[in-house]
Amino acid sequence: LSRDPLAYVGKTPLTGNRAAVEMLKASDLVLDLMTLLFSAEQHEILEAGGRILLVVEPPEILVRMTPTEEDRTKVLTASARLRAAKTMTVTSSAGTDATFALGQYPILEEYGFVDKPGRWDHWPSGFLATWANEGTAQGKIVLAPGDILLPQKSYITSPITCHLENGYVKAIEGGFEAEHLRDYMESFNDPEVFAISHIGWGLQNRAHWAVMGFYDGEASIGMDPRACAGNFLWSTGPNNEAGGERDTACHIDIPMRNCTVKIDDETVVQDGKLTGDYA
């Protein structure tokens, strides 16, 4: 459907190329310039102890968000709290009110460098995520004008309401943009594209919400809005990178502004701003 590397995930030019896979498994560090995310080959390389660093953004974005030890400390501090949490609640003045049970899946800690065997990361980054327990995502998420759809790389202009039930998006309501999103997801002919995937929030102060609008759609994959400090980032589709069984090819990332995110009773994001030790 698209040349965007994240518009169809799981199968890559490396798929079925055993000689290349074995060579990469024997390597200490793999710089991924083609996006192996969600592929069986990536899992195999990581399980062999290889380190993978995904690097696909334009040079000026890489320079602006060159990872630092401070990024790592910030992500790991928030991760320790998320790891102990049992629930995540997200609300917004636009009408979002959703809950997710936690604990079944690991934490995704993205701080931009790979400092131990078997670790995957993405430069640039600076955010934290996990996956909701299977079947537990409930409520509704209301995308407001200015929120972003990826890989479409579009700022929406009118509200889109996603109704969550038992871990899936059961209905998508709104105007043309809601219809466009629904049509795109349905084109994969796979009910698993509507499953809730990772959920979390951005921690990177050097990421900027407005930057994506200055790039051609194929020049960037949109790491600025994914990592932007204080966003709520949620997604649909596969969870195989977390040890789950969903291997669908459609993965939608949706960074949102102006949300309040709570883990258990602690507010980590208030109206789109990081709070306390997370700021």
Task: List the model feature ranges, each with a label.
Residues 155, 171-236:
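Dual-mode signal for accessory low-complexity, basic/Gly-rich regions
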Residues 1-161, 165, 190, 260-279:
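Active-site bordering "gate/hinge" segments
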Residues 153-154, 210-213, 245-247, 273:
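Short conserved micro-motifs at the rims of enzyme active sites and ligand-binding pockets
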Residues 143-145, 164-166, 173-176, 203, ...:
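Active-site proximal loops enriched in glycine and acidic residues that flank catalytic Cys/His/Asp
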Residues 107, 148-150, 179, 206-208, ...:
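Short, acidic Gly/Pro/Ser/Thr-rich loop/turn segments
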Residues 219-270:
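Internal helix-turn-beta structural module
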Residues 117, 215-216, 250:
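Short intrinsically disordered coil segments
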Residues 123-128, 139-141, 197, 202-204, ...:
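Glycine-centered flexibility motif
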